[in-house]
């Protein structure tokens, strides 16, 4: 094993705790909002602003976070993000005004976005090639666990006086543990991949004996500017296009909006009592956790490319199935948001409410349970999670029902179609959790040179957030233009394009060091790389594998 067991455990802990903080912060607002909207007499617009504040903070972090990560280091960025989580939590606990709540949530969003990028990059650099996929995927598991913990806290603290302060404050606990854990890990982990890759010597021991300064690989001699991402130097333009393709297809396959209709689908198959809704949410949570565990187990065995392809194929089939079935199973796509106060909203506020609202259930109890369904379903990579969390919380601020409940008198074939829809949605969630969810971020943490990896990762991440916003804010217009069924079918077409993109352009990176991956991208074209990816898993005992590839494809 490349890393000593304590170091490996610490690396896994850092990845897991980072995901827990991310998931908890996105999920906890659902319970807190139930109290806050009464305490502060919030309008719909104010509730939506409070929920969306995390999203805007995260988007801001994705724009400037790469500079922080590359200039001050991955570990420093993670440590700083924990301190920012602490600051944001204190603001939320101590505040007595609505606008300070906004400031606190924006601060939290900024922190968890920085942490998510830095964690994925840091862990990918500190572990051996055969461990990288598993440990980076642990971040996804942490997100799922964090959301489940937030749901439990929402339940247990619901009757406590000023419960929202405790809800926000508990985020300090996992952040503090992550802060302590990472103090025992090296500050410059990328050197680990250069040293004695087939022995048990790790970076920490080499740094202590001074051996790390005797050799500096030329990969880290190279300096890059941000503009190099768009130039042909070392095939950087190709790498950028690959990263952008992955994050854009991750969003444009419709993943956020499909899950906005989870409550409608559950109601259409008869989950209308409290116990049934809880069962549905638990079932979806089990599917999510199981799928994430599958991704962890097979990321370094089956490989990133295989899981991306398999996940995207299942997603395409599932979303197409939902589209076809929804021609028969009527689901009301109307969105509404009712204010808890008597204050009038401006037309602008009303428009924002319509754009950001989702399908609502009939009672506040069902709203809360549907909210948990969304949270469990959306335990995925950073931007996707943030937007889904927004949808969850907006369930809570609804007062009017627009769901068409299933009737017990419906014919059996109609019931079968409802269940097909439900199973298709679960398959979609599962496939995303195995493929696009974790694999996108593993690949992004691998394909860029170390000197610009943070900025490149953040650049792609900003497009992910932007695409997530775009697809959400245009969803109503698309439905109004072509209908809900055709919207889902359109996502299916995008899924087909994503399959082609992955098949023809995404290489396999399992089993390779980050330096070998960088060399391959620097010395040959992407199509050549894909053709040779079948032999990637077994590296020669000496000498870099790209030499053999170069002989096969002389330029």
Swiss-Prot record:
Q: Where in the cell is it found?
A: Endomembrane system; Cytoplasm, Perinuclear region
User: Where does this protein come from, organism-wise?
Assistant: Xenopus tropicalis
Cellular component GO terms held in the UniProt record: endomembrane system; membrane; perinuclear region of cytoplasm
Whether Disulfide bond counts among this entry's keywords is no
Task: State the protein's purpose.
Answer: Facilitative glucose transporter required for the development of the cardiovascular system.
Q: What parts of the sequence cross the membrane?
A: 16-36, 49-69, 83-103, 106-126, 133-153, 166-186, 241-261, 278-298, 306-326, 416-436, 465-483, 486-506
Report which reactions are catalysed by this protein. Answer: D-glucose(out) = D-glucose(in)
Q: Which gene encodes it?
A: slc2a10
Could you say which residues bind D-glucose here?
250-251, 441
Question: Which protein, by its recorded name, is this?
Answer: Solute carrier family 2, facilitated glucose transporter member 10
């Amino acid at each position: 094993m490349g890393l000593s067991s304590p170091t490996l455990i610490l690396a896994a802990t850092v990845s897991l705790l980072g995901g827990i903080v991310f998931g908890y912060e996105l999920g906890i607002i659902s319970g807190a909002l139930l109290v806050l909207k009464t305490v502060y007499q919030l309008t719909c617009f104010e509730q939506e602003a409070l929920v969306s504040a995390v999203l805007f903070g995260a988007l801001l972090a994705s724009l400037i976070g790469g500079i922080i990560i590359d200039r001050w280091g991955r570990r420093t960025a993670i440590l700083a993000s924990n301190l920012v989580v602490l600051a944001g939590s204190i603001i939320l606990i101590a505040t007595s005004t609505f606008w300070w709540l906004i400031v606190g949530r924006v601060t939290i969003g900024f922190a968890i976005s920085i942490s998510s990028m830095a964690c994925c990059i840091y862990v990918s650099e500190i572990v051996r090639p055969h461990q990288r996929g598993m440990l980076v995927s642990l971040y996804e598991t942490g997100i799922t666990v964090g959301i489940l913990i937030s749901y439990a806290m929402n339940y247990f603290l619901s009757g406590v006086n000023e419960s929202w302060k405790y809800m926000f404050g508990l985020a300090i606990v996992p952040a503090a543990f992550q802060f302590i854990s990472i103090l025992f890990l090296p500050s410059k982990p990328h050197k680990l991949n250069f040293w004695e890759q087939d022995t048990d010597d790790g970076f920490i021991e080499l740094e202590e004996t001074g051996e790390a300064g005797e050799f500096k690989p030329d990969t880290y001699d190279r300096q890059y500017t941000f503009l190099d991402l768009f130039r042909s130097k070392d095939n950087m333009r190709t790498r950028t296009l690959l990263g952008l393709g992955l994050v854009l297809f991750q969003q444009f396959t419709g993943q956020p909006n499909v899950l906005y209709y989870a409550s409608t689908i559950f109601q259409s198959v008869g989950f209308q009592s409290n116990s049934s809704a809880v069962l549905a949410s638990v079932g979806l949570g089990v599917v999510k956790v199981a799928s994430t565990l599958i991704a962890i187990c097979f990321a370094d065995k089956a490989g990133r490319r295989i899981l991306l392809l398999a996940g995207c194929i299942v997603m395409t089939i599932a979303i197409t199935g939902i589209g076809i079935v929804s021609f028969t199973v009527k689901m009301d796509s109307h969105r509404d948001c009712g204010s808890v106060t008597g204050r009038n909203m401006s037309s602008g506020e009303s428009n924002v409410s319509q754009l950001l609202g989702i399908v609502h259930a009939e009672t506040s109890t069902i709203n809360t349970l549907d909210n948990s369904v969304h949270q469990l379903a959306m335990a995925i990579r950073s931007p996707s999670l943030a937007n889904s969390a927004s949808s969850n919380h907006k369930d809570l601020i609804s007062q009017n029902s627009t769901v068409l409940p299933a009737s017990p008198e419906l014919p059996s074939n109609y019931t079968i179609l409802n269940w097909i829809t439900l199973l298709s949605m679960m398959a979609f969630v599962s496939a995303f959790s195995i493929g696009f969810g974790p694999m996108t971020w593993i690949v992004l943490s691998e394909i860029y040179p170390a000197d610009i990896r943070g900025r490149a990762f953040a650049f792609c991440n900003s497009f992910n957030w932007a695409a997530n916003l775009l697809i959400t804010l245009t969803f109503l217009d698309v439905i109004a233009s072509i209908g809900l069924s055709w919207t889902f079918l359109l996502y299916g077409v995008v899924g087909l394009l994503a399959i082609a993109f992955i098949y023809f352009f995404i290489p396999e990176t399992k089993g390779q060091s980050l330096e070998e991956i960088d060399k391959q991208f620097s010395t040959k074209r992407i199509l050549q790389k894909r053709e040779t990816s079948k032999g990637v898993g077994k590296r020669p005992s000496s000498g870099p594998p790209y030499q053999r590839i170069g002989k096969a494809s002389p330029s």
